[in-house]
Amino acid sequence: MKHYSIQPANLEFNAEGTPVSRDFDDVYFSNDNGLEETRYVFLGGNQLEVRFPEHPHPLFVIAESGFGTGLNFLTLWKAFDQFREAHPQAQLQRLHFISFEKFPLTRADLALAHQHWPELAPWAEQLQAQWPMPLPGCHRLLLDEGRVTLDLWFGDINELTSQLDDSLNQKVDAWFLDGFAPAKNPDMWTQNLFNAMARLARPGGTLATFTSAGFVRRGLQEAGFTMQKRKGFGRKREMLCGVMEQTLPLPCSTPWFNRTGSSKREVAIIGGGIASALLSLALLRRGWQVALYCADEAPALGASGNRQGALYPLLSKHDEALNRLFSNAFTFARRFYDQLPVKFDHDWCGVTQLGWDEKSQHKIAQMLSMDLPAELAVAVEANAVEQITGVATNCSGITYPQGGWLCPAELTRNVLELAQQQGLQIYYQYQLQNLSRKDDCWLLNFAGDQQATHSVVVLANGHQISRFSQTSTLPVYSVAGQVSHIPTTPELAELKQVLCYDGYLTPQNPANQHHCIGASYHRGSEDTAYSEDDQQQNRQRLIDCFPQAQWAKEVDVSDKEARCGVRCATRDHLPMVGNVPDYEATLVEYASLAEQKDEAVSAPVFDDLFMFAALGSRGLCSAPLCAEILAAQMSDEPNPMDASTLAALNPNRLWVRKLLKGKAVKAG
């Protein structure tokens, strides 16, 4: 069975207060002066003090084996802050640190270890505040207002490096080869790891490690590094340093799912919802010039305009990609929303998903069998539901203690205001009619004979995504739905968590003393007119799921308060994030893909045209991480997701899966 939680570090603290691994019988850092050793071995061994001011790019990428207590990272972060303060006009503006950890510390142990270095406290406290729960895969932490990015990959480094997306190939400027001593942890120090380090290192990339073991030096030389010995720190006689003097072009591992970025840094985003807003922030943080074109007179008038939306992960025991995306997207979303410097109505009150019938009970039982961390999800028995949620349902279920609700409309509006303060240009009442290539740019034709030219375009306009010739064949569909707004009652006012059943019910929003109950589902419809049938059905589904609950029968929808919206969805429930694929060229180039995979060319796409769509009903959960994924791709930066999950987000995936099996593909 696949496990979705990671085993935490098994450690104790010795007489000096130094953490020691019980499993590896080794210290996490030197008893003498771990901080100075880090500065000498890793910062000095990679010559970072000299390289930072001379770096010709805005981003410096460092990768590390073994995050441990984060001492190396915190020391580096402090040094980077000092560099930026001393060289504010330098080309280098941002730091990206990638680290792998098989047995992450608990937050409590991390905080205890950090007490050793009071001079690192300002940085350590920020790390502790965002420390992720023990889920496998990549956890992206945005620190110092996005100037420092930390990618924590939880799992075995030798397994994870084989699962990385090609976006990391030849991107690493410096390697910190750390971890428990080779004699204590031989399973990590393998030729497989050394080869992966070489693959990820950019030309001129360096490495440093505390060990001088001969097999390590020979293995790194075999991988392609030029190695040399250097005086070790303190009582250690020698350590190793290396450089990747030259690299060869690397073939794409799965060219049919290849992701291409852009060398340009000027973009038009089409849309006005949460996808557009969050992508704008992610691109602005990377130095892009961003313009946004919204068809409406104001933002969040489409699917992002609801008063309350639930935030919790979409999990399925039988869908690996779904679990990888939504479990890590959920934790990223919580960190992201918590540090946003804008106001929006929200309450992280928890979400309880109830088993109201045999089918839903079976689904919940399968989710609970996935060995999920308790911070993510826990079982709740029927007799405990009332205590947790505040209302009686006579149903058992699964609780997401870090879930809750937020106001999507307010979030979208205020994020766009924040983005405007950072340079975003917004054009309202610009309905895009079509777009075409002109002189290596995109010519945008809007209703009313308005035109604009942009280097790069992102289509993030929800269910209208398929209205252009470049996207008309995409396998997406519209879903119209109505959310009912109901006044609170004394019984409903007791509701403490979001309830999910064959619908959902939110606790009251203190701003308006109303709850949201929804939502109707009409696949293939774009009708946004109020429906009395939908209003009554929203109420009836609640009553049908909890027939013994008197409070459910007292729900009042008679005032006809509701909001109707249209979502964009796919049949596999995953967003479409990446290059807009060229349908006709895909069919031609991949006509014999099943027999000629070794000869496949890179996925046919429209140059400098991207899409961010099909968020379905879980956009509040997936949008923050997907915005980060797309912005990283467009900027040719490391992506915070493994290759197979990125393939599951590729807009061409449904076509390619059929072509790989030798099956015919139809448009739409």
Swiss-Prot record:
UniProt xrefs under InterPro entries: FAD-dep_OxRdtase, FAD/NAD-bd_sf, MnmC-like_methylTransf, SAM-dependent_MTases_sf, tRNA_MAMT_biosynth_bifunc_MnmC, tRNA_MNMC2, tRNA_S-uridine_synth_MnmC_C
BP terms from Gene Ontology? methylation; tRNA wobble uridine modification
UniProt key word Transferase: yes
- Reported EC number(s) for this entry are 2.1.1.61, 1.5.-.-
Give an example GO molecular function: tRNA (5-methylaminomethyl-2-thiouridylate)(34)-methyltransferase activity
Q: Which Pfam families match?
A: DAO (PF01266), Methyltransf_30 (PF05430)
Major site of localization recorded for this protein: cytoplasm
SUPFAM superfamilies hit by this protein: FAD/NAD(P)-binding domain, S-adenosyl-L-methionine-dependent methyltransferases
Where are the annotated segments for FAD-dependent cmnm(5)s(2)U34 oxidoreductase? 270-668
Q: Which UniProt keywords apply?
A: Cytoplasm, FAD, Flavoprotein, Methyltransferase, Multifunctional enzyme, Oxidoreductase, S-adenosyl-L-methionine, Transferase, tRNA processing
> Region (tRNA (mnm(5)s(2)U34)-methyltransferase): which ranges?
1-245
- Which compartment or compartments is the protein found in? Cytoplasm
Which first-to-last residue range defines the signal peptide?
A: none
Q: Report the catalytic activity.
A: 5-aminomethyl-2-thiouridine(34) in tRNA + S-adenosyl-L-methionine = 5-methylaminomethyl-2-thiouridine(34) in tRNA + S-adenosyl-L-homocysteine + H(+)
List the cofactors. Answer: FAD
Domain of life from the UniProt record: Bacteria
User: Per the record, GO CC terms?
Assistant: cytoplasm
- What is the annotated role of this protein in its UniProt record? Catalyzes the last two steps in the biosynthesis of 5-methylaminomethyl-2-thiouridine (mnm(5)s(2)U) at the wobble position (U34) in tRNA. Catalyzes the FAD-dependent demodification of cmnm(5)s(2)U34 to nm(5)s(2)U34, followed by the transfer of a methyl group from S-adenosyl-L-methionine to nm(5)s(2)U34, to form mnm(5)s(2)U34.
Which family does the similarity line name? In the N-terminal section; belongs to the methyltransferase superfamily. tRNA (mnm(5)s(2)U34)-methyltransferase family. In the C-terminal section; belongs to the DAO family.
Task: Report what the protein is called.
Answer: tRNA 5-methylaminomethyl-2-thiouridine biosynthesis bifunctional protein MnmC
What is the species of this protein? Shigella flexneri serotype 5b (strain 8401)
